[in-house]
Amino acid sequence: EENLRVSVRDYGRGIPQGKLVEAVSVLNTGGKYDSKAFKKSVGLNGVGVKAVNALSSRFEVRSYRDGKVRIATFSKGNLLTDETLDTEEESGTYIFFEPDATLFLNYSFRPEFIETMLRNYTYLNTGLAIIYNGQRILSRNGLVDLLNDNMTATGLYPIIHLKGEDIEIAFTPVSYTHLRAHETLSD
């Protein structure tokens, strides 16, 4: 069923084609380990994609780079096919998966949870645009947008926003509000 499958396409550099199969199937490979990349990375150095691969009845990864696309397909983490073709598509990565129904009985995806998580990525990566089911998710102001989107009461003062190369802080005092259903009180 179409609602039980996921596909993701980005337009970054693409996973290096020589390491594509290992990057999605072998632990401790494919991560962004240098300090500059790690500051901006939101994830666990590829552990998640390897787990998704192992727990999927169908998993496909494509890396588009330099006029070539390398396509690898898997089932339950086992490599089924691996080929490289010419392409005119933009650089980037495509991943498709269908969770293994023998492991995940009667599973379903929760669109509101997925949208919230994707929105959180945009707060942490200002300017990143994500298209989810035809809806564009974008944060131009990072943590300021996070506060504005989640506060149920007006702050006592304008949001204070500090952003440096390695840190971003946004805060404002409020008298009484709920933030993501958690009640907060002040004296």
Regions found by a protein language model. Name each.
Residues 1:
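N-terminal, positively charged regions that mediate nucleic acid binding
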Residues 4-14, 18-19, 30-153:
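GHKL-type ATPase core
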Residues 21-25:
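ATPase catalytic-site recognition across NTP-hydrolyzing enzymes
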Residues 134, 165-166:
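Intrinsic-disorder/low-complexity loop/linker signature
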Residues 157-158:
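Conserved, well-structured core domains of diverse proteins
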Residues 161-163:
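A short catalytic or substrate-binding loop motif that flags glycine-/basic-rich loops and adjacent residues
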Residues 167-176:
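Short beta-strand elements
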Residues 178-181, 185-187:
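Single conserved hydrophobic/aromatic residue that forms the stacking wall/gate
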